[in-house]
Regions:
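Membrane-interface alpha helices of multi-pass inner-membrane proteins
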Residues: 1-15, 25-27, 46-54, 228-229
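Transmembrane alpha-helix segments characteristic
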Residues: 3-8, 212-231
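A juxtamembrane structural motif centered on a specific transmembrane helix
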Residues: 205-217, 249-267
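Perimembrane helix-loop-helix junctions
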Residues: 21-52, 250, 258, 262
Length: 267
């Protein structure tokens, strides 16, 4: 529990998205019916360690930033964007809930973090009212989710197009989205992507009704639901999924190997 809390605390400061895995571990822990007393003790240890690590790193990093780079609280208040900014961008129809430079420029027009937060909240509520329930659901499933999960290159070809390194290199022409040979890249990545997701779905289906074998991969399934919910609420981008690729590969392998095992037993 202590080790997990330390790792989660460090992860929180590096990048918040993988922190979803820590939350998935906690949820999976409580979905198990046995050993409630031990689970409560373990959770308490994790939370105390997590809180301590986050606080310690936060204090040290703030002091380091001020001493080495002159980044004071006043500078942060002037330039730092609140979390509400990315939620606001996630509701922009023009970008299908993705990054929007207009929103970035708009948030930057306000002088303090408090003003930016209040204005972001106002825009968020206004955009939700404009959607309505039915249109918002349609926006999620037909705009945001395809923009998130419908890119087999995880936006890598787009970023390479923006800042190409050795643009005339044959490999770059294969990888960037407007390259002369990019179709070969798409054939490979989409084949891999479909096989990957088919294995993940297979793993979930084969786990139904078999609780005994479900537990090892339960954390991965909960984390996948978590990242999907995160992308719905946040500014969506397919590159956020890259962090979870190792876990997705393990889940796909579980699906294929379990299927093979079941077929072997049936014979």
């Amino acid at each position: 529990g202590i080790i997990l809390g330390i790792v989660a605390g460090i992860t929180y400061h590096i990048k918040v998205i993988p922190f979803i895995v820590f939350l998935a571990i906690v949820i999976a822990l409580f979905l198990q019916k046995e050993r409630w007393y031990q689970k409560c003790i373990l959770l308490l240890m994790m939370c105390l360690t997590l809180g301590g690590v986050i606080q310690c790193i936060g204090v040290y990093s703030d002091q380091y930033a001020e001493d080495c780079f002159g980044i004071t609280d006043a500078i942060k208040d002037e330039w730092e964007y609140p979390l509400t900014h990315w939620i606001m961008m996630g509701l922009n129809e023009k970008s299908d809930g993705g990054y929007m430079q207009e929103d970035v420029a708009y948030t930057a027009t306000f002088e303090t973090r408090k003003e930016r937060t209040e204005e972001n909240v106002r825009v968020i509520l206004a955009r939700l009212r404009c959607f309505g329930a039915a249109d918002y659901i349609q926006f999620i499933f037909f705009d945001k989710m395809p923009r998130t999960w419908g890119d087999s290159c995880f936006a890598g070809d787009d970023y390479l197009f923006r800042m190409p390194y050795l643009p005339e290199c044959p490999l770059v022409q294969i990888m960037k989205w407007n390259g002369t040979s990019h179709s070969y890249c798409l054939i490979y990545t989409w084949t891999y992507y479909v096989i990957l997701f088919f294995g993940i779905v297979l793993s979930g289906l084969l786990a139904l009704g078999h609780r005994g074998r479900q537990d090892p991969m339960m954390i991965g399934r909960i984390a996948m639901i978590g990242i999907a919910l995160f992308q719905i609420l946040w500014e969506c981008n397919s590159r956020y999924v890259i962090t979870f690729l190792p876990m997705m590969i393990l889940m796909a392998l579980d699906g294929y190997f379990t299927c093979k095992q079941r077929l072997t037993q049936a014979d």
